[in-house]
């Protein structure tokens, strides 16, 4: 009986000490944030808060918000940006949650007269996942070849940071990274921090990193969120439910190669093939989000295409070289198959969720790259129109093209094979209107001519 009493007494004491210690830590961090904001050697450099909608960045933003409320913002008008990067292939369930949260943040900041502005960054059209994978034939990423991280995550945010540095001279990036999150995260923080200083230099010139909650434990973080509703309104109930259903952490704002990308059970891109299994998607499906099953099936197919290059990829690389064990881009018919599966998945989930997986602009650029790779037999619009009832026409001059085709047939009566060649060359020429840079067009035309000569079994003459 005495031992039971002592155990209960000990547990209560531990909980009291933990709660008291956490409250002291929170107060200390808030005071530190206020001090950094007010007494910075450069009071004009903006704060850029990396926000992913997950638990770490949510706590960071909430603490900064509460600190700013204690400052006379009429006197101190340092701009604060809440930057959220959308790769355009994020887990759709997370996208819906984040979009609503960002809307609440901006509305509340305006009402509370806080100099906070929400900014959403996205990759350039030519850098999107589908343009590179389906258009150019880039293989699904793995841990050794993560071509997606720079294009989808680092570059969009970097462009915004550089814009602010160009305008203000310097910028401070606030991140929700924590040592307790993982061993690799702890090692990264320790490796880059400067002892005795709050800020560390970022890889970008005139940019600095500030991680106010780096020493907060995960248990304390959840306790804080459970006890303190977000100052922008509502509760953290939806956030907690997401974690409960997906059993994972959140993706950090990736600003350089030292920041770990998402994997294991973390929320991230639904197309991510860096890991074998997407545990967060599996868990969401198991917890009632069955509409995500088509996405899971497509992701698993991408893993298959990556793991069996001898089936799905060209032997020859883009530079024309061939080497044992070194594979080229996806075969053209494989790219068409991936697009077909993607559009079928989009049609299926749009019936219940209304989510768009690929944009019209991306499909136009994919067609451009297919033309450049001399893939003319199958067109993007043909694949789309077989799946959807609302047809798309990528050629506003379709009637003109038909007239051109008839004229070509008449002109090439004696050499009917030349009709296809000339049509392909015209298609290549027309695609240049899609891109600002026309570099490589002459090489594309030369490649098509050489391909035609090879089909006729004639000797190929290289310049």
Regions found by a protein language model. Give the residues of each.
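Nucleotide-activated chemistry modules centered on ATP-dependent adenylation/adenylyltransferase
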Residues: 2-48, 55-463
